[in-house]
């Protein structure tokens, strides 16, 4: 059976959770970590995802991709993409006006869209869940920042499809966190909760009213480009400048040194959340020069002061939009790793006149937790905890069409509860106008040129008539994912046309997605083949070394004779030497080599064990003989199942 999970697809870290038996389980990955770095690395031999990718970032900076969430659903000429591309050690290039990353993989130059990179992270989370649950996982609720626009949401949904998942729903991160906060507070009367969600790359503030299991979002605001990464950037720039001042060496173009500096900066930032000073020590950072310095919390706060202060603007905005005074907020819930920064906590507390934030939920796991609850609801879970739970979310940005003079005419104002449907009647601007161009925008500005164009379509075949006579009904329909459908109907002729906003500028076509799905399968198969190759290599290595250890046992030579012992020692050593020189050999080569070695070893080992009436005295110490006894087949060696034993007549 397939089980549904909740996935928090984060800028820097991702998290997966599952709801069953009235509780949410955050699922740890194969390293035992409850969050997984949103990193993908490409090498000459393999693709790495998660911890393994992040751990080798310093030695492979150009081919280690991170922060895909900062590129997803955006255009290449977006100023924020341009700024980010300067910081990234990997190459970001333009393809059809969209950003794609360029890396070297298995000796070839490859390009990947942000959707593909995100899909690789999602497939890692899917695999983590499957390993834990022991069953296939196809359905998922995936979270996005509340302030993500239509194309960013659509692109995230596409990433899920490429990863081979059915995305049940895209939900907003602060709303998911609110579920985590409110799930056990069913008996409490209506209260207003402000979710302050500052993560690795994005920032959201949502104000909700929670009453008996009904979670109603009143207003939302944020910045899809503000988070811990920006604080790290400030620290890296500061440390690089200090290194230059001390050594007269500029490391700004050395990606490996910058990566090591970034790792140290991130570690220092975390340390400063619990202590007022920390030291940074990096041996041989650049041209053999060490870098030792110390950093105080006050200095860090000064470096990021403007960024920290800017987090209060969205707080003021949601209060204004929901027409509430700060004194009417009952709980402030901090979500996202960056809310551990003491200065952020103090700013929020001071803004609310000294009110202490609620610390009842884990800031790293709350979003995945809420997503898992929503996944359970959408797949019909009958738990009493989720039965009366109702989520009423909102559209983060106003939606409308362009009317004469480039004016933005809003059909759905921001913070409208979704799903929602709204129609308005328009007419022609000129006499005998044969058609109209419906251009759909999102944003708050009066003129459309200052807003974001989502898509456009033609409604043609309007019969000749004076201006203002034809009646054209335009309908906006937002689904529960926050994704928009627009239709137009000319009343006189009944002619209609519609568009699901697929944002041709930022969205993948169906063919692209299908191609990426099949490529993802190919990469997955490559990964499995590589894992099999490494296993065959390790098996042979383990076998050869165990043979070598057995030869050194005191009784070995007297039981098998000098010649056989010498022959086995030579064969084992030759295999070990061959392995050292053949790190990139194929699976079959390793298996053939194992068979060869077994051909020499098995008769000798049979003699050794036979002479000792069962297991020789050294068998226990060396863990037993790990290879194959005669007729046990080549694959028996080195498996975790232990020695292969067969009955002797």
Curated annotation (Swiss-Prot):
Gene Ontology cellular component terms for the protein in this record: cytoplasm; cytosol; nucleus; plasma membrane
Gene Ontology MF annotations: ATP binding; ATP hydrolysis activity; ATP-dependent protein folding chaperone; heat shock protein binding; protein folding chaperone; unfolded protein binding
UniProt-annotated location(s): Cytoplasm
Keywords: ATP-binding, Cytoplasm, Nucleotide-binding, Stress response
One GO biological process term: protein quality control for misfolded or incompletely synthesized proteins
Metal-binding in keyword set: no
Region (Disordered): 608-649
Keyword Cell membrane: no
Record SUPFAM superfamilies: Actin-like ATPase domain, Heat shock protein 70kD (HSP70), C-terminal subdomain, Heat shock protein 70kD (HSP70), peptide-binding domain
Gly residues: bias regions: 611-626
Additional comment: Present with 6440 molecules/cell in log phase SD medium.
Homology family: Belongs to the heat shock protein 70 family.
Cross-referenced PANTHER family: HEAT SHOCK PROTEIN 70KDA
Protein name listed in UniProt: Heat shock protein SSA3
Lineage of the species this protein comes from: Eukaryota, Fungi, Dikarya, Ascomycota, Saccharomycotina
């Amino acid at each position: 059976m397939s089980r549904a999970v909740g996935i928090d697809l984060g800028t820097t870290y991702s998290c997966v959770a599952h709801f069953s038996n009235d509780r949410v389980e955050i699922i740890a990955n194969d390293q035992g970590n409850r969050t997984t770095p949103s990193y993908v690395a490409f090498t000459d031999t393999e693709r790495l995802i998660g911890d393994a990718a992040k751990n080798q970032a310093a030695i492979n900076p150009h081919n280690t991709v991170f922060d895909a969430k900062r590129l997803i659903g955006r255009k290449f000429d977006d100023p924020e993409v341009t700024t980010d591309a300067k910081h990234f050690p990997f190459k970001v290039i333009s393809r059809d006006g969209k950003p794609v990353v360029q890396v070297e993989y298995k000796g070839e130059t490859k390009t990947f869209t942000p959707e593909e990179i995100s899909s690789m992270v999602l497939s890692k989370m899917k695999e983590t869940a499957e390993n834990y649950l022991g069953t296939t996982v196809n359905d998922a609720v995936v979270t996005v920042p509340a302030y993500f626009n239509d194309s960013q949401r659509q692109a995230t949904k596409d990433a899920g499809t490429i990863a081979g998942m059915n995305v049940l729903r895209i939900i907003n991160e602060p709303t998911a966190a609110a579920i985590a906060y409110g799930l056990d507070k069913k008996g409490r009367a209506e209260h207003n909760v402000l979710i302050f969600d500052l993560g690795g790359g994005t920032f959201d503030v949502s104000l909700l009213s929670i009453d008996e299991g009904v979670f109603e979002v009143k207003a939302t605001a944020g910045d899809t480009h503000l988070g811990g990464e920006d604080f790290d950037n400030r620290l890296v720039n500061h440390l690089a400048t200090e290194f230059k001042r001390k050594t007269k060496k500029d490391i700004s173009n050395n990606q490996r040194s910058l990566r090591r500096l970034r790792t140290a900066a991130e570690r220092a930032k975390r340390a400063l959340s619990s202590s007022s000073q920390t030291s940074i020590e990096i041996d041989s950072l650049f041209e053999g020069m060490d870098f030792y310095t110390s950093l105080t919390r006050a200095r860090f706060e000064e470096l990021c002061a403007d960024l920290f202060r800017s987090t209060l603007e969205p707080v003021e905005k949601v209060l204004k939009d929901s027409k509430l005074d700060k004194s009417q907020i009952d709980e402030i819930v901090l979500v996202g790793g960056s809310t551990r920064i003491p200065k952020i906590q103090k700013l929020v507390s001071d803004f609310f006149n000294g009110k202490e934030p609620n610390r009842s939920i884990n800031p790293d796991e709350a979003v995945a937790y809420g997503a898992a609850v929503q996944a359970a609801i959408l797949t019909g879970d009958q738990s009493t905890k989720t039965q009366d739970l109702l989520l009423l979310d909102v559209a983060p940005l106003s939606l409308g069409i362009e009317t004469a003079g480039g004016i933005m005419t809003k059909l759905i104002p921001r913070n409208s509860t979704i799903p929602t449907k709204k129609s308005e009647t328009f007419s022609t601007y000129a006499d005998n106008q044969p058609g109209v161009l419906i251009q759909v925008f999102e944003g708050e500005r009066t003129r459309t040129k200052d807003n974001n164009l989502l898509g456009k379509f033609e409604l043609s075949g309007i019969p000749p008539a004076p201006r203002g006579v034809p009646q054209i009904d335009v309908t906006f329909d937002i689904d529960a994912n926050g994704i928009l459908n627009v239709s137009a109907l000319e009343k006189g002729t009944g002619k209609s046309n519609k568009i699901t906003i697929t944002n041709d500028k930022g969205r993948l076509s169906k063919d692209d997605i299908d191609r990426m799905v099949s490529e993802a399968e190919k990469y997955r198969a490559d990964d499995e083949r590589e894992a099999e190759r490494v296993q065959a290599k390790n098996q042979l290595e383990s076998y050869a070394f165990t043979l070598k250890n057995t030869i050194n046992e005191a009784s070995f030579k007297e039981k098998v004779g000098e010649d056989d012992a010498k022959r086995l020692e030579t064969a084992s050593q030759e295999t070990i030497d061959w392995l050292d020189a053949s790190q990139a050999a194929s699976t079959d080569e390793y298996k053939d080599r194992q068979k060869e070695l077994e051909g020499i070893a098995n008769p000798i080992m049979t003699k050794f064990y036979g002479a000792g009436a069962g297991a020789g005295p050294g068998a226990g110490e060396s863990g037993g003989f790990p290879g194959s006894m005669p007729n046990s087949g080549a694959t028996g060696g080195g498996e975790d199942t232990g020695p292969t034993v067969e009955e002797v007549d």
